[in-house]
Design a protein with these regions (language model features):
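Secretory targeting and sorting signals
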Residues: 1-21
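Short amphipathic alpha-helical linker/capping segments at the junctions of internal repeats
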Residues: 317-322, 363-374, 410-423
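Short, exposed beta-strand-loop hairpins at the edges of beta-sheets
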Residues: 269-270, 405-411
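Extracellular glycan-recognition/adhesion modules and their associated mucin-like linkers
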Residues: 22, 285-308, 324-354, 373-402, ...
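Acidic glycine-/aspartate-rich tracts in secreted/extracellular proteins
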Residues: 205-206, 245, 255-258, 307, ...
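Carbohydrate-active catalytic/glycan-binding domains of CAZyme proteins
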Residues: 22-289, 324, 369-373, 378-384, ...
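Short polar catalytic/cofactor-binding loops
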Residues: 30-38, 46, 296-300, 307, ...
């Protein structure tokens, strides 16, 4: 017993502070099938699995909020621009410092004669730092939309140039999204006749654009719209788009600069709910994405299943076993918390001594229940154990493969309470 007591005291040696590596953060703004008057905001750490930050997060004082596009400006503030109505000559603007609480700025009238429809504004920041919006316009007496660009005339994004058409992209194109690689502008745009998303390039933002992919060139099928692109950490590009006729939302990846694309997949948990969205990727927040490997069952990893925490082999889907190890919610100095990667905003916490996955409710009780001190492994100091922050004599351990917190008073308990953080 004395040996065990000495060993237990030894493991109280704290490990270095949690990893300071940055996890990329993907912020999504969208309207939904249930409402075109409210914006929802989601967050992801892998660009695939998104958790709700707030919904509704913003409701304009009047009109609609369709097609919200998000930008982080040089002032550190987040801005969205959006479609204000089915008919009209305005686009809307709102701002936020935290992506959750939004303030209406203004509706801007575009000075185009006989403008009847002003749809799908998308931010585009050029390599010279200029801020632009790509927008689809239709005037009275015409049957088709034409992509245009407007340019910010001041740093506060309150004054804008007159719309300039994108040569080579119209009429008959809508929902245009542009990225720039090197000196080339790459435009993804919906053909309103064939209902395909097509692809064109130019050496100038305003064109002329030359089509490189038309019809079903990428294999996504037709009756799709609202393309939005992000670059993933592995260098490949992801396009997300709205399969509006099927009521589904899709994504597809390209590893060869848009030459070919993977088969489209439905966006997990959000397909069938979100509509025409945009995603902003930022180099992110402190914390590493890791899996927790059991010391005495090395083929098993911690995972969540129906919001319960357990260890299992051959975890499927593997994302259930990936956690972002972040500075502790209750104490960021020498303590950690475990945030789910595929359910962002949900953390491992103890409840009646059993570990569960639960959404952070912002209370002090939650923060303490979800915080653990990472110490040298109770069975092997080269591994790691996790002592409860608010029940300091107890550690995360598995018992009958279920994760819980318990005092450690046996060699079996020491092995059950020891884990290794491994790359996903």
């Amino acid at each position: 017993m004395l040996a065990l007591t000495s060993m237990a005291l030894a493991v109280l040696t704290l490990l270095p502070a949690p990893a300071s590596a940055a996890t990329p953060v993907y912020t999504m703004t969208a309207f939904t099938n249930s409402s075109e008057s409210n914006m929802y905001v989601y967050q992801s750490y892998d660009g695939t699995h998104y958790g709700l930050m707030k919904g509704p997060a913003y409701t304009p004082p009047s009109g609609l909020i369709r097609d919200p596009s998000i930008l982080r400006h040089t002032d550190g503030v987040y801005y969205v621009t959006y479609t204000t109505n089915w008919d009209g000559n305005t686009i809307g603007f709102a701002r936020s410092t935290d992506r959750v609480n939004w303030t209406f700025m203004q509706n801007v009238t575009l000075p185009t004669a006989n403008l009847q429809n002003t749809w799908a504004p998308e931010w585009f920041k050029d390599s010279d730092g200029s801020i632009n919006i790509i927008v689809s316009l239709r005037t009275t007496g015409t049957s088709n939309f034409t992509p245009h660009v407007i340019k910010a005339l001041n740093a506060s994004l309150t004054a804008w140039s007159s719309p300039v058409p994108l040569s080579g992209l119209g009429p008959n194109y809508i929902d245009t999204f542009i990225v720039k690689l090197g000196s080339t502008y790459h435009a993804f745009t919906k053909n309103e006749t064939s209902k395909y998303i097509e692809y064109a390039t130019a050496s100038s933002l305003t064109g002329p654009y030359t089509f490189k992919g038309t019809g079903d060139w990428a294999g996504w099928g037709n009756w799709v719209e609202g393309p939005a692109l992000i670059q993933l950490d592995n260098g490949s590009w992801r396009i997300l788009f709205d399969g509006y006729s099927s009521g589904k939302y899709y994504y597809s990846d390209s590893a060869n600069t848009f030459a070919s694309w993977s088969a489209k997949k439905e966006l997990p948990s959000l397909t069938g709910f979100v509509r025409h969205l945009t995603v902003l990727k930022e180099p992110g927040q402190a914390g590493d994405i890791r899996r927790l490997q059991s010391f005495n069952f090395p083929d098993r990893y911690a995972r969540h299943y129906d919001y319960q925490a357990r260890i299992e082999p051959n975890v499927s889907p593997v994302e259930d076993s990936r956690f972002r190890i972040v500075p502790g919610l209750a104490d960021g100095n020498g303590a950690v918390s475990f945030e789910s990667v595929n359910l962002p905003g949900y953390f491992l916490r103890h409840s009646n001594y059993v570990l569960v996955l639960a959404r952070d409710d912002g209370t002090n009780q939650f923060k303490q229940d979800a915080t653990f001190r990472d110490v040298a492994g109770t069975a092997n100091p080269a591994w790691t154990s996790y002592q409860s922050y608010n029940v300091p004599g107890s550690y995360i351990r598995h018992y009958n493969y279920t994760l819980r917190i318990d005092p450690i008073n046996s060699s079996t308990g020491q092995s059950d309470a020891t884990f290794k953080e491994v790359s996903p």
